[in-house]
Curated annotation (Swiss-Prot):
It comes from the Bacteria. InterPro entries: FMN-bd, NqrC. It is found in: Cell inner membrane. The chain crosses the membrane at residues 11-31. NQR complex catalyzes the reduction of ubiquinone-1 to ubiquinol by two successive reactions, coupled with the transport of Na(+) ions from the cytoplasm to the periplasm. NqrA to NqrE are probably involved in the second step, the conversion of ubisemiquinone to ubiquinol. Pfam families: FMN_bind (PF04205). Its EC number is 7.2.1.1. The modification FMN phosphoryl threonine is found at residue 223. Coiled coil: none annotated. This is Na(+)-translocating NADH-quinone reductase subunit C. GO terms for molecular function: FMN binding; oxidoreductase activity, acting on NAD(P)H, quinone or similar compound as acceptor. It comes from Vibrio vulnificus (strain YJ016). It catalyses: a ubiquinone + n Na(+)(in) + NADH + H(+) = a ubiquinol + n Na(+)(out) + NAD(+).
Length: 255
């Protein structure tokens, strides 16, 4: 009997310790997920501040973001601003929800993203009461990964003022050079559209002609990643992406 009692006590201790450990692990996992989400938000805000050309040295990114950046929701079909909480809207999640997105046909899907949310986010860069730039979030498939970037556009709705990739899994030293500041700098001053308002950015294998309004050099040794960048611009500047919104910007829609 004493032996049975001892076994029961031992089992009770083991079960109790297991429960305590599982609670600790679960709590730690939840805390870690929350921290990871917070870090992801901070990183995204930092990239938006960077591509907007705002000096963040010695300053807190969340405070700068709140001061200078205004997220707004845009209806892709019409290009109009729509009501909603742009600060908490998750466009990736919405794209996976059939009620909030559309499945793209092969003909529509230049960027190989499969689905597109019905509503997108743009970030307006504020200078006092005026808007100085627009930040467009874009993404498209590369060789190995989906590549996510922010493109800064002047208020003419046509001139690029910057681009930064904030999430990608391309080959380091090859396709991964989409993050290289020297390569990204080529986009500054380029025109997104031609005189007929058609998407005109060209990623040129072997190098863009000197003085080209629309061309940037392709990535050396990374043709498929370069193609992915090209297709990303083709899609998001087109009618299925931010094309209708940018057309309204060019017509003075921000005023």
């Amino acid at each position: 009997m004493a032996s049975n009692d001892s076994i029961k006590k031992t089992l009770g201790v083991v079960v109790g310790l297991s429960l305590v450990c599982s609670i600790i692990v679960s709590t730690a996992a939840v805390g870690l997920r929350d921290q990871q989400k917070a870090n992801a938000v901070l990183d995204k805000q930092s990239k938006i501040i960077e591509v907007a050309g705002i000096d963040s040295k010695g300053k807190k990114v969340p405070e700068l973001f709140a001061q200078y950046i205004e997220p707004r929701l845009v209806d892709f079909a019409t290009g109009d601003f729509v009501d909603g909480n742009a600060a908490t809207y998750d466009q990736r999640k919405a794209a996976k929800d059939p009620a909030q997105s559309i499945k793209l046909t092969a003909e529509q899907d230049d960027a190989k993203i499969l689905r597109r949310a019905n509503t997108g986010v743009v970030y307006l860069v504020k200078n006092g009461d005026s808007i100085s730039k627009i930040i467009l979030p874009v993404h498209g498939n590369g060789l190995w990964s989906m590549m996510y970037a922010f493109v800064a556009v002047e208020t003419d709705g046509n001139t690029v003022s910057g681009i930064t990739y904030y999430e990608q899994g391309e080959t380091p030293g090859l396709g991964g050079e989409v993050e290289n500041p020297s390569w990204r700098a080529q986009f500054v001053g380029k025109k997104l559209f031609d005189e007929n308002h058609k998407p005109a950015i060209k990623v040129v294998k072997g190098g863009a002609p000197v003085g080209s309004e629309h061309g940037v050099d392709g990535l050396s040794g990374a043709t498929l990643t370069s193609n992915g960048v090209q297709h990303t611009f083709d899609f998001w500047l087109g009618d299925m992406g931010f094309g209708p919104f940018l057309a309204k910007v060019r017509d003075g829609g921000l005023n």
